């Protein structure tokens, strides 16, 4: 079982709860992070979830690199728009060799065509999209039991 999971959220996800609530719901990123941390605590086996959000690609890459040094065993990532553009985030995930799940609140395949391409999904253990914020719960549960 993985003891340490890193939950990464990319650009604009800090606006959850107020950004396009008809699409993303009204749950804030803070609420999602708190729920993930509590989910790990309920395991009662010293599991923990670390959380990180940044709007800047380079800082996200740096955080992925840091995860390896911290002994993170699994990453759950919603890279937001960087999903569709960032070779750098893909390479960072591959370079650290930490297994990861890609999460999206909306079903990206029902949205604009440019959102159908992911630079991450072919290397992810799994992709969860379209389940709303429950997708985070499912991903964290899987990661904690990996």
Swiss-Prot record:
One Pfam family recorded for the sequence: DHquinase_II
Keywords, ordered alphabetically: Lyase, Quinate metabolism
Tagged with keyword Lyase: yes
Lyase keyword on record: yes
GO molecular function, one term: 3-dehydroquinate dehydratase activity
Binding-site residues for substrate, renumbered to this chain: 78, 84, 91, 105-106, 115
Active-site residues, as the UniProt record annotates them: 24, 104
Residues at the site labelled Transition state stabilizer: 19
Catalytic activity: 3-dehydroquinate = 3-dehydroshikimate + H2O
SUPFAM superfamilies from the UniProt entry: Type II 3-dehydroquinate dehydratase
Pathway noted in the entry: Aromatic compound metabolism; 3,4-dihydroxybenzoate biosynthesis; 3,4-dihydroxybenzoate from 3-dehydroquinate: step 1/2
GO BP annotations listed: 3,4-dihydroxybenzoate biosynthetic process; quinate catabolic process
Enzyme Commission number(s): 4.2.1.10
Record-linked InterPro entries: DHquinase_II, DHquinase_II_CS, DHquinase_II_sf
PANTHER family membership: CATABOLIC 3-DEHYDROQUINASE
Family according to the record: Belongs to the type-II 3-dehydroquinase family.
Classification via NCBIfam families: aroQ (TIGR01088), PRK05395.1-1 (NF003804), PRK05395.1-2 (NF003805), PRK05395.1-3 (NF003806), PRK05395.1-4 (NF003807)
Biological role: Is involved in the catabolism of quinate. Allows the utilization of quinate as carbon source via the beta-ketoadipate pathway.
Subunit structure: Homododecamer. Adopts a ring-like structure, composed of an arrangement of two hexameric rings stacked on top of one another.
HAMAP family: AroQ
Name of the protein: Catabolic 3-dehydroquinase
Organism: Candida tropicalis (strain ATCC MYA-3404 / T1) (Yeast)
């Amino acid at each position: 079982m993985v003891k340490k999971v890193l939950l990464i959220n990319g650009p604009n996800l800090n606006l959850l709860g107020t950004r396009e609530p008809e699409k993303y719901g009204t749950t804030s990123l803070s609420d999602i992070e708190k729920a993930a941390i509590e989910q790990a605590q309920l395991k009662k086996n010293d599991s923990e979830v670390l959380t990180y959000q940044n709007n800047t690609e380079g800082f996200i890459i740096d955080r992925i690199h840091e995860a390896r040094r911290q002994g993170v065993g699994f990453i759950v990532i919603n890279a937001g728009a960087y999903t569709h553009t960032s070779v750098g985030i893909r390479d960072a995930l591959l370079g650290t060799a930490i297994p990861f799940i890609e999460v999206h609140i909306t079903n990206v395949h029902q949205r604009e065509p440019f959102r159908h391409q992911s630079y991450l999904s072919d290397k992810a253990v799994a992709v969860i999209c379209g389940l709303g914020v429950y997708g985070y719960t499912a991903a964290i549960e899987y990661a904690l039991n990996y």
